[in-house]
Amino acid sequence: MRFLISISLSFIISNTNLVASEKLFPNYITDVDGNELSFSSLAENKTVCLITLKSINCPICLEQLKRFKEKITQFQKCNLTFVVLAYADNKSIKALITKVDFPFPFIQDVDFMISKKLNLDNQPFELKPAIILFNGDGTIKWKKIGRSNQYFSDQAIEDYLDCDNWI
């Protein structure tokens, strides 16, 4: 019985994609409008959620941003803020921002500098789609890699955060 519990527990832990305490989020990032943002200011009294876009033309990624936008009020209950990471030129990212109207910073991943640290680069032209929650010190709190037309990670992040039960 202990063996089965141990195996089950190992499976559950490995499937949540939890990561050790290496600091992976940069101290400073620049959004596509040229604004320098410090991680400490983003994370002040908030949990930073990084959303990576597989590509600028990924329809599944765009739909997910639209759904997250619809749930902003719910996510604000548990002090969540977002940053979107994309590998594309600034002009294309700005066109995307206009299209999805997602009211959080978009970051251009120049030369895969950020995604490489997170093991999310899928060179030569894409990122691995992911949702990552960061602790206030820049270490990873939770992550889920991958999305498809059958699985968006929305439910996983909602279940993990359980914002409806925050006071």
For each feature predicted by the language model, list its residue ranges.
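Bacterial N-terminal signal peptides
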Residues: 6-15
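Positively charged n-region of N-terminal signal peptides that target proteins for export
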Residues: 1-4
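Thiol-/selenol-based redox modules, centered on thioredoxin-like
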Residues: 127-167
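N-terminal "domain-start" segment that seeds a small globular fold
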Residues: 16-41, 63
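Structural microenvironment flanking redox-active thiols in thiol-disulfide oxidoreductases
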Residues: 62-101, 112-116
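Structural micro-motif
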Residues: 102-104, 122-132
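Short active-site neighborhood of thiol/selenol oxidoreductases, capturing the structured segment around
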Residues: 40-68
